[in-house]
Amino acid sequence: MQPMHIVQLANFYGPRSGGLRTAVDQLGAGYVDRGHAVTLVVAGRAHDDEVLDSGVRRITVPGRKFFKVEGYRAASPVLIRRLLPRLGADSLEVSDRLTLRGMGPWAKAHGIGSIMISHERLDRMIELGAPRRVATWASDVANLGTARSYDTVVCTTAFAGEEFARVQAPNVETVPLGVDLGTFRPDRATPQARERWSHGADVLLVQSCRLSMEKHPARGIEIVRALVADGVRARLVIAGDGAMTDELRRQAYGLPVVFTGHLADRDDLADLLAAADVAICPGPHETFGLSAMEALASGTPIVVSRNSALADVTRDGCGLPAADTGAAFTAAVRAVLDGDYRRAARTCAEQYTWDRAVETMLGLHRATADRRRFLRDRPAGGRAAVAPARSSGAWSTQRAV
């Protein structure tokens, strides 16, 4: 099979980007391992051009700081459009629904395949600052435009795809991401790791997430406050950084809560997750929940928001869902501590492999690249062998933006 050149585009890619960065890096490395060329274009402080250990060429384009936390930068689409013709891509893989949404039409105009990976629920994000009715309307208009602009839209779970199903987008594929089963393992739960992170506490809780509003990061503090009030010798380790760090430290004052900041060392994070009794995953908008999957791979059960994609994962007996209140999460944590959930945790995580995700994504890239190449190279005025037209009914309800 002929090798492809896949160009990945990802603003907001940085050391603290969490699941997005992990997904982009794992997919890119998998493509290279299978003989394809990969160029990753990201935003940063200054221009850079380097080859990563994975074999991926990473080009950094100067970008402006987008959020309060360092590492979230966005490069101008104009700069990226100037760069793309020099790269010779067969297919684009875009991991940004906001600042790079115009890359799909650009790819079509240049005969290049295009895939957009939806890493979040747009309707949920808009709803953080707008009434639900407004959020639904705005996301429907935007999602309709996105689906029309790209050859394929990839969602990581059925939950993530619900907002595209609502506008009847016909070009949506569900591709679950993977988890690093080699790094995150139950056998890391050694007495040394337990002592390091628990400091003698009877119950060790972990919460690994970005400390920003949409993640509901104060939930873990509410839980440990309730447990301590009932005489439980509990300790909470919060691994992550974000705009709410100072506020959360104030809330946790006087409680057995430790803030590690961003844990850049994956081995440290893996030891922590394996040593914990329960991983708290409070974000109600998670479309996949990579940090939760890393906890499960480590053999640690999870307590999750019943309004996120992770609620479906817990049906396999690896944890419990809870309503988005401190009391509900505390009750679920108590139930998990009293139950037998660890056995199912690793088994659940083993269903999600990067090999499977990479192979599925390569199939989509091949299909879109071949179709665009055919349309680009057919004789002028030729009409034969074009792809069947899609039903107009799915597109006609609203004008794309």
Model-derived segments and spans:
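Nucleotide-activated donor-binding/catalytic signature segment of Leloir-type glycosyltransferases, i.e.
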Residues: D246-L263, D267
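Carbohydrate-associated surface elements
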Residues: F159, G178
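Nucleotide-sugar donor phosphate/pyrophosphate-binding loop at the beta->alpha transition
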Residues: A75, G113, R124-G145, S149
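Short alpha-helical donor nucleotide-sugar binding micro-motif in glycosyltransferases
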Residues: H262, D271-A276
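Conserved donor-binding/catalytic core segment of Leloir-type glycosyltransferases
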Residues: S198-R225
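Aromatic "clamp/platform" in nucleotide-sugar-dependent glycosyltransferases that forms part
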Residues: P284
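Short hydrophobic beta-strand element within catalytic cores of glycosyltransferases
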Residues: P301-V304
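Conserved acidic donor-binding segment of nucleotide-sugar-dependent glycosyltransferases
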Residues: F259, D316-A327, R334-G339
